[in-house]
């Protein structure tokens, strides 16, 4: 599967993704923000667009739909609850469905509520091995999505603890936004001795701003992303979270409670 990440220069630092099946040449856009930007990319390749998928209903993930449907007549997929909310979405996808499927590669749909209740993520599988995951606003580099606009932090905790914690470490993470530097600073505000976060922040500082972006895998995320450490937080992380969260809200050795506490702290940070 060919994967192309397009930085949109949007106020919320959105990413759009273009995926192309290497066997069938079918092409998909995930979370199109700017239809003209995507058309320009496709024209440069001499490609058309077969499918759109919106991970959820928020406008910054769907604003390119109308222009792309008008140009290419492509099919628009979404979570079943997104039909009627997402422009031009007509084809619902449920957990376990597939897109861009061929003999060697496919995208598997995950039902991932929390940021909103009609959110899906996509797991890229090649030669029967998970290779990458497209997470929309469920998980970011070194962070997770907020729950301010139609979500629930307890549901998000359940989604991430049950569906993402068990995934293989080699899987690459492709989120819906570039929030890495900000999220690393949040990690270090609670866990200032986290050497992996320090090194990753230094790595970010050497990149060309708005041109180059780090791609992390889940192995790195488990080191730099506090939301992936809720089952085994470091002593320093646990101590600093406990200082800021009332005792009655932070239950001992409860990953869900710790996750919700982190999400609350991130909301206020």
UniProtKB/Swiss-Prot annotation:
GO terms for biological process: methylglyoxal catabolic process to D-lactate via S-lactoyl-glutathione. This is Hydroxyacylglutathione hydrolase. Thiolesterase that catalyzes the hydrolysis of S-D-lactoyl-glutathione to form glutathione and D-lactic acid. Pathway: Secondary metabolite metabolism; methylglyoxal degradation; (R)-lactate from methylglyoxal: step 2/2. GO terms for molecular function: hydroxyacylglutathione hydrolase activity; metal ion binding. It catalyses: an S-(2-hydroxyacyl)glutathione + H2O = a 2-hydroxy carboxylate + glutathione + H(+). It comes from the Bacteria. Zn(2+) 1 binds at residues 56, 58, 115, 137. Binds 2 Zn(2+) ions per subunit. Its EC number is 3.1.2.6. It comes from Leptospira borgpetersenii serovar Hardjo-bovis (strain JB197). Monomer.
